[in-house]
């Protein structure tokens, strides 16, 4: 049995807290376009010549109320003072009349800040950790794009015309410069192209699809949303689908930061929570709907949401959306409801893994798309140190205790080290949480049987450091951004190498370092080869005993559905169209693509077939 290291975590854990953002010196600038009307100002009952009585003018303006709009059309914007071009209440005013968008309520409900005046930054921007991103770790990342006429990448946000209001929010979020996936994905999306992007967890994918969507809605023509008699049916312009409620809430939180004082209204809908409040939020108007598939199908069947006005469709963690039972729901939403077809809408798919079979399914939703693969940050800088230790089932708890004691002994006094422990079952999560607490290690747990309030409380308690150990099933493995996780422990290894990749991606985020420890025994034999290959591709030390397991013929075929066969990566870092087009002129089709060090990332044009290893050149495995 391998002896656990009592100090290894300290060599790689990033203990620096995220610096608190300083308040902005200037108030928000006004957007520079006037075509957009926020949802709560549309189709108002005010009229200068109709039968409806006009509401009283806003206290901040003496202008006349807007004329009544024809059915199905948008009302002209009222000329309220201070509203800003493209303003109009920030989506928070319901149907009660115009509001100054510089008085938009804090999205996080800070009642003490009634108005975000000049120099006042809302609480929503507090504790943002982007200034802690280690951009030096991104400098040598290989990037590949394939498809026709790929737009060139950008180096700074100043090169991208996103609009003044959105640029102000980028500064409020302390975004210094784009991450690699943002450098490539944002110009592609702003050019109106469909996109399939494969990029590391924690690399800024949410902003990569939110920025173009918000900018496009602000700049786009007024939407002619349908009227459905007396029923209030929400007709969003953009739909963002995600597989879990936690991830949906996280995307919603980030999107509200980015859309602050732009007039773009963001609403979230997910299962496991009362639907009535979500219906009320939708009735107030929605531009961007963030939803899980199950709850969205429910809303569509109730005719409370229509997708016929959708201009933008984004799938986050798209590989999971098209796998593990989600595909029928996603296909029903995208293909069998009233959503515009590919070509009439813009579609963006993002994930950390894109196996070939998932790419084939996803291509049904796309038209003339660009494939983007961004190499793993830790492939050359070893930001995530992976350790695999042989531990029998009966010894796992005592072995975990040894690791936690070593971690506690080496920790900085007063600064808890966040540790995420993954187990396979819900019962196992509850049992291990109780055992840890009984042995002096404050812990909490999150899994599918917890109600929404319990899950939110557990995440808050963990993020704050009040309970620095979180025991979780895979419900927390996908997409969640939990800053400052120093150590991920795979107490129970998953059966699929993709799930392992997503689990360890909870640490080493934003270019920071982290440690991932896995407990391996005979029950995990089918994972041996895939695990050894992943560690080799990531420049990790592979234990000799694991190499022997991997070499055994009886264990060679495991590791889940995405085991490598031939060239390319099991994680889908290579456009499957390249392989299917080989031998029949595929090179001409992809003449617009680029690879390797394009745009200053990655110093070579050969790095293993798209930055994921398995081809010619230096291997580079990335999730």
Curated annotation (Swiss-Prot):
Residues 1-120, 553-595 are annotated as: Disordered. It catalyses: ATP + H2O = ADP + phosphate + H(+). The keyword Repeat does not apply. Transmembrane segments: none annotated. Residues 399-550 form the Helicase C-terminal domain. ATP binds at residues 199-206. Residues 10-29, 70-83 have a biased composition (Low complexity). Residues 54-69 have a biased composition (Pro residues). Its EC number is 3.6.4.13. Belongs to the DEAD box helicase family. DDX3/DED1 subfamily. PANTHER family: ATP-DEPENDENT RNA HELICASE DBP3. This is DEAD-box ATP-dependent RNA helicase 52C.
